[in-house]
Amino acid sequence: MASLVYRQLLANSYTSDLQDTIDDISAQKTENVTVNPGPFAQTGYALVEWTHGDITTDETVQQTLDGPYAPSSVIIQPQYWVLMNPETADVIAEADATNKKYACVMLAPNTEEGDKQYTILGRQITINLGNTDQNRYKFFDLASENGETYSKIQELLTPNRLNAFMKDQGRLYVYHGTVPNISTGYYTLDDIANVQTNIKCNYYIVPKSQTQQLEDFLKNGLPPIQESRYIMPVERSVQNIYRAKPNEDIVISKTSLWKEMQYNRDIVIRFKFGNTIIKSGGLGYKWSEISYKPMNYEYTYERDGETVVAHTTCSVAGVNDFGYNSGSLPTDFVVSKYEVLKGNSYVYIDYWDDSQAFKNMVYVRSLSAEFNAINCTGGTYDFQLPVGQWPQMRGGNVTLNSDAVTLSTQYTDFVSLNSLRFRFKPAIGEPFFEITRTRETRLYGLPASNPMGGNEYYETAGRFSLISLVPSNDDYQTPIQNSTTVRQDLEQQISDLREEFNQLSSEIAMSQLIDLALLPLDMFSMFSGIKSTIDAVKSVTTSVMKKMKTSTLAKSVSTITEELSDAATSVSRASSIRSNASVWNNLVDTRTQTSVATNDIATQTSRIASKLRVKEFATQTEGGLSFNDISAAVLKTKIDKIETVQPKILPTIITESVDKFIPTRQYRIIDKDIAYEISNSGKYFAYRVDTFEEVIFDVEKFADLVTDSPVISAIIDFKTLKNLNDNFGITKEQAYNLLRSDPRVLKDFINQNNPIIRNRIEQLILQCRI
C-alpha cells in the first residue's frame, strides 16, 4: 500500500548523525556585540534599543498643561479650558459678543466694598465690588447688554490666583463657588466660537479631557515647576507657521559616522486585491474555495516634480469564512468556503519606493502615518454551471481606514525590500452582497469573488514620517539593505509551493489515484520522480526523516508507545490480570469507561478517533484501502506534477501532508452484522451491515472491540453508503466490500461514473491541502 512510505519515515525518523547535531549547535550560536552610536536625539547617552518606533493607535494623548502664555487677544478653540493666573487685581479677561458683553475681574483679599472703576472693551465703567475675606481672592463675572452698565453674575472665592473658562457647544463655561466646593455654570453668547477673547494676564491651556486635573489646580494651585523662575511666558504670535513639503529630509543629530534623519513623505498608495477561485472536480456544480491571496503591484506617480517608482503588496488577515450548500446531490450548487472582509478583519499594504527614505531603513523610531479612507466595492462573479441559469455573487462594500504602521519586508522575483506596512481597518457599508438565485442575500462585507469591482487598482493619498539612523556619508549604504535571511527565502518558496499543491487537487484522475494508492510506495519511489532530486534522493530522504520527528503523528506514536508500555507493566504487576480491553480503555481515556447514559459520547468518540489513526498503522487489514494510502498517493501525484521543487522544501511539505491531509476522518469497526463508525469531529453511528438501519451506539461494547478488532478507514462513510443504497441500491456483498474499503469495488464504482462515490473521493482529494 502507498502508506508504506509513511511507515518507513516514522520508523526511521529518530535517527540522527553527528554532523547534523554539530550544524544545529553552530546555527544557534550567538555573540554579544556592543555598539556606541554616539550622542543622538539631543541626549548624552547612547541609544538603548532601536525598534520599529511608535505604533499608531486610535488614542490621542494630549498635554495636560500647555503654557504659560503672555497676555494676548486670541480666538480660543472650543473644548479647551483657559486657566488664568493673574498677578494683579484688575480685569483679567473680556469678550465682546453680539448679544452680550462679558468680563472677569479679580479682587485681592481685604478689599473694601465700594465703587471700582475698570476699563472694559475700551470703555470706563463703574461698579460696586468688594472682598472682605482675609486670605482669599475673589473673582467676579460681569455681564452687560449695552456695554455701559455691568452687573455681577457669578463669584469664585479661592486662596489661589486661578480661574478658568471654556467655550463648548455654543456656551461659555465658568467656575463659581468657594474652594474646594466649586462647580461650573455657563452663559449663552452669540457666535461664541468666533468671538475674540482679550486675556490680560498669563494663562495656560488645558484640554477638556483633563477637566479633573484642572479642578485640582483650582483647588490646590499650580505644581511647583510652573512657578519656577526659568519658565518665561511667550506671545502666541511668535509661533512659527511651518508649511510641510511633499519631500522633507531633516537632520535631527549628527556625529562623524552616524546621523539621525527625519524623513517626511507625501505618498500615493495604489494596490490590488488578489484572489484564488478553486473549482471542485466532478460535474461542475461545486466550488471548493474562493479566497484572498497577496498581490504585488508596481506603479509610478509624480511627487514634488519627480517621478517616483513604487511597489506595494496587499494582503489580508482575520477574514471571515462563509459557505453555501444547496444539497448533497452531485448536481446541487455548492460553495464550500468563500472569504469575506468584515469589521474584524485587517488589510495590510506594504509600500516601498525608490526615495532616500527607504535606502537605509534599518534603525527606525518615531514612525507615524495617516491616510485618506479608501472605499472598496465588490463586483460580480458568475458561477458557470453546466446546465441552467448561473448564480452570481455580486456587491459588497468596505471602507478602509488607516489604523497603524510598522516596518516590513516585501518579496519580489529578484530581491527583498525593506518597506513600510500600513494597516487598515475595514468598516462595512452599502451595498450588501448576495448570491443570486439562492437564499444568500443581504450579507455585509467584501467577498473575495471579485473584490476589485472592475477597478484596475484602489488608490489613496497620505503621509508618513520616521526618524532613521543612517551613515553620515550619504554614499554609504548599510549592508543589511535589500537582503534577507535564508529562512525568509525558504518560507516564501514553501508558501508558493503550498499554493501550487492545493490548486493541483482538481487535476487528479480518481481511477489512477486508486491504482497508485495500491502500490507499495517507498521513500525512493516517492522522491525519485522529481528531476531536481534524482541525484540526491538519499540526502532528501534523510532530511525528510529528520523533519518527520516534529510531526504530530510522530509525537502521537511516541506517546501511545509509552502508554502501551506503561499499561502492559501495570497488567503484569496487578494482583488480578485485567483484560486487554480494559488496558486499551485506560490508554484511550479513563473517561470512556462510562455508561451509555453519559451525555458526552461525542467528546469520548472524538478522543478515541484521534488515536485510532495510530492503531490503524499497526493493524491495517490486508487488501483494504486507508486514508493514509490516499494521502500518500495524492502526495506522490502532486510531487510528480510540479516541474521544479527545491529539495530543501520537501521535508516541510511532506511533514505537513502527514498532519494536514484529510483532517476529517472516519474509522469503522465491524462486529458480526453491526458496524461502529466514529469521526474525529465527534460524530458516531452504529448500524446494521445488511440494511444500514441505525441502532443504539454502545460505548462500552465499542471500547471492548477496539482492542482486538482491526480498525478500518471509512473511505465510504455511513452517510454516503446510505445515500448510495437509497438512490441506486447495492447488494449485501457490495455493501460489505465498501465497508471494508475494498479498492477493487471502489474502482468499479468510479469507472461506472457513479456520482455519489466519485463525489466522496473528490471530497477526500480536496481535503489533501497544506
From Swiss-Prot:
This is Outer capsid protein VP4. A motif (YGL motif) lies at residues 444-446. Belongs to the rotavirus VP4 family. Residues 480-507 form a coiled coil. Disulfide bonds join C314-C376. Residues 244-475 are annotated as: Spike body and stalk (antigen domain). Pfam families: Rota_VP4_MID, VP4_haemagglut, VP4_helical. The record marks R229, Y230, R243, A244 as: Cleavage. Residues 65-222 are annotated as: Spike head.
